[in-house]
Structure formats: C-alpha cells, structure tokens
Amino acid sequence: HSSSDAKNVYVYSYTYDNMERLLSVSLAKDGGNPATLARNTYDEFGHLQNCRLGQSMEGIMQFRYNIRGWTKQIISPHFSQELYYECNFGNSEPCYNGNISAIEWKSKDTTIASTIVSQAYEFFYDGINRLESADYSSSVVPGAETAVGLTLLNERDYSCTYSYDLNGNISSLHRK
C-alpha cells in the first residue's frame, strides 16, 4: 500500500509466510531505506506468540493461550491483559463454552512513575448465553490512592446491563 501527497511518499511493505501469516511490516519514506515497524513470531500451532514493535524492536508484546487455543494473556512493558474463561474472577461464574467470564487489564499510569492501574469487567450471561451484565471495577497500587487523578478512577463505574425481547434483540441497555 502506498499513499502520497505533494511532499511525502510513504510505502508500507508487508511480509507473509507460506501459511499467509503476517511476519513483518516495514515503512519507507520518500524512497529511503525501509524501517521495520513490527515483526511477528508464531508457535507450532499457528498462534501469534510475540509481536515486536518499533524500529528498536524493544517493545515486545507476548501472547499466551489456554489448552483450547483461546487467548489467555497479552503482556507488554506498559500493558497487560488477562481473559478468564473457566476460572472464577471476583463474582463471575466459570464459562466452559468459550464465553469470557472476566477480563482484567493493567497499565502504567503516565502521570505517576511506576503506578499500576488495574481495571476489570466481570461478565454474566443468561441461560442462552446472551450477555446480561458487565460489572466494572478498578484499583491502583496500594499507597497511590491519594495521588492526583487516581482517586477519581475508583469513583468511576462503567458497568452495563442488557435485556432482550423475545426475538433476541437488545431491548434495553443501561450504563452507569
């Protein structure tokens, strides 16, 4: 793919393996040498294992899977995410059918060095696997609650509830 304007010409190059999996993304500006933006590696099952980002390739994202091949974790230097299926998380019920029972993500707060903010949703389903509610929670590293801006995080609530009509269409959606 290429795009150009009066001053700049950008050429993106994509490299794939024989199984049509994306191996790398490069960018060349104004006919210069291409710089690698991302490089992917895969495990023996074809799952994305690592994604190295940036020209220095220092920003690495790691992907982990459960025995069924479902994404379980995404880990990077500034962000991590974990999906819960068959495990209890808070009040959520284990889901053995592929539904996600909870998701938790952690990120570094950019305003305060080394402060980790943890946020999560617990999901609840009805008898035919329709999402009934998503309960939000958040927390920060102990001792950081008094930091500017972080106390407000604990006061936010992004929880949702859903209801459906007899045809399975969403009839109401309530956000807090």
Where are these regions (language model features)?
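Beta-strand elements of repeat-based all-beta scaffolds
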Residues: H1-K176
